[in-house]
Each structure stands twice: as C-alpha cells, then as structure tokens.
C-alpha cells in the first residue's frame, strides 16, 4: 500500500511467469493462510508415497535468514546437515520432521538450482514435493496441487492474497 500510495507500481507476477517446470512429477502443498497445516499435510503425502516405494524429495519455501550466498542450495538428509548449515529454530522445526523420517529436503534461495539438484538427488527422486510457505503459490509447476484451508477460519479462503490463487488453481 505504501508503494502504491507513493505513486509507484507494484505487481505480483502470476504463476505462468514464475513457476519452473520439473523433469519429475511435482506435488505442491499450499494453503490459503499460514497455519492451516501445510507441513503436516506435506509429511503425510511423503509418507504415503514412500509406502508405495517412491523416492520423494521435498523442497521447502525459502526462509532467507543469514548469508544468502551460502544458502544458494541447501540439502538436508540428516540432523547433522541442519546444524552444518546453521539453520534457525524455525528452519529446524520445518526440516527436522522430514529428515528423521528418512526423507531428503532441499531449501535455499536459487530455486532453479534447487530443483535441478532435487531431480538428481544422490538418494534418487521419483517425485518432487513442494512444501509451501505462508500462503504463497508454488515456485514449481505442479502436476497435483493440494490447497489446505482452515475450517476454523471460514471465508478466509476467498479473502487472503495470494493464498486465494492456490484455491482457484
């Protein structure tokens, strides 16, 4: 609002201009609001796919705290990896549940490089799972998009931006 009221233009680019295409199937988990349960939903989907014998590599929405050059591409397959990358408490809360289940999760700030690394992960990759953040839409073109809504906040699915985008996709 401050930018617009000062006379400048501000536009959030749409999905066609921002989403990257993967060579692997992509499942994206997003939400209309933060706090709807994306992380729990993501972990359950990973669990179900792993039970089917698929190798799932998760990619987390960025939390750019600290040295962004060092955070270009981060791969977490163990608790030690989380400590080596000096993850914040918030990052640990998101990533630790994946690695203790034996899943690999990527993060960072260069999402083209992250996607290519995930597709070629040393442990293998059959499916990329986008674990969204806040109420943003996915950075990767999903083959399946799961949008989580909060039953305790009815109506919010149509009144929060950009979360409403994922509901309408």
Residue ranges and their predicted role:
Residues 1-28:
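Short, basic phosphate-binding NTP loop
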Residues 36-37:
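Conserved glycine(s) of the Walker
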């Amino acid at each position: 609002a401050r930018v617009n009221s000062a006379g400048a233009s501000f536009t959030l680019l749409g999905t066609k201009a921002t989403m990257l295409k993967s060579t692997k199937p992509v499942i994206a988990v997003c939400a209309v609001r933060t706090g709807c349960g994306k992380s729990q939903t993501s972990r359950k989907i990973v669990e179900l796919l792993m039970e089917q014998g698929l190798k799932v590599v998760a990619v987390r929405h960025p939390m750019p705290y600290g040295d962004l050059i060092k955070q270009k591409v981060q791969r977490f397959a163990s608790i030690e990896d989380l400590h080596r990358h000096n993850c914040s408490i918030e990052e640990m809360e998101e990533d630790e549940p994946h690695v203790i289940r034996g899943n690999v999760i990527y993060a960072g700030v260069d999402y083209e490089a992250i996607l290519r690394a995930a597709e070629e992960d040393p442990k293998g990759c059959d499916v990329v799972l986008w674990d969204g953040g806040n109420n943003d839409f996915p950075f990767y073109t999903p083959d399946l998009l799961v949008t989580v809504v909060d039953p305790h906040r009815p109506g919010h699915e149509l009144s929060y931006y950009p979360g409403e985008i994922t509901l309408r996709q």
